[in-house]
């Protein structure tokens, strides 16, 4: 297991209690036997980059699963739904960590990171489904999917009687 994967795995034990913060980052580095300096080399912004890498790894896993289970006979909307459900199922494995990540990403200073994360996920989904559009549709597909994904995540991670 790489240092990056080890830090993510260890931090997931602490995030539900402490959130994605300096304390979690320091505890993860200490438990992994990595100095804070080495940790900062891997994640220059500390817990923020650790959180974004955690999300990115789940996004990459979702793309692998979607590509491997691709059913070209389905309509695009069904394939998009499958991709979204796959991503939500992956988030379910660490729901509280995802909830804490979304809380952090909703802060004003995190808007650029949040926008990039949502855009990259939308782009990855459309690319994994073989989107070949080159006109304005390229943008509208990604913006629309990003909006749907963001709304779905907010609903999914919000506290409710279902929990």
Residue ranges with predicted function:
Residues 156-163:
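Conserved small/polar residues in nucleotide/adenosyl-binding loops
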Residues 109-131, 141-150:
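Amphipathic alpha-helical packing segments from all-alpha helical-bundle domains
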Residues 2-37, 45-52:
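Short, amphipathic alpha-helix enriched in basic
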Residues 55-61:
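Short, basic, alpha-helical segments at the C-terminal edge of helix-turn-helix-like DNA-binding modules
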Residues 65-100:
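Hydrophobic alpha-helical connector segments
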Residues 2, 100, 104-117:
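Domain-scale activation on soluble regions of proteins
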Residues 8, 48, 81-88, 119-126:
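Hydrophobic core segments within long, regular secondary-structure runs in both alpha-
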């Amino acid at each position: 297991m790489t240092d990056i994967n080890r830090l993510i795995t260890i931090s997931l034990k602490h995030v539900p209690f402490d959130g994605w913060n300096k304390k979690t980052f320091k505890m993860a580095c200490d438990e992994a036997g990595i100095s804070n300096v080495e940790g900062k080399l891997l994640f220059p912004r500390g817990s923020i980059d650790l959180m974004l890498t955690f999300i990115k790894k789940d996004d990459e896993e979702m793309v692998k699963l979607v590509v491997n289970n691709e059913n070209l006979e389905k309509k695009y909307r069904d394939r998009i739904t499958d991709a979204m459900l796959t991503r939500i199922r992956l988030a379910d494995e660490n729901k509280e960590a995802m909830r804490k990540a979304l809380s952090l990403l909703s802060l004003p200073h995190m808007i650029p990171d949040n926008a990039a994360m949502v855009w990259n996920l939308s782009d990855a989904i459309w690319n994994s489904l073989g989107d070949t559009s080159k006109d304005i549709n390229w943008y509208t597909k990604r913006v629309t999917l990003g909006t749907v994904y963001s709304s779905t995540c907010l609903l999914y991670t919000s506290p409710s009687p279902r929990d």
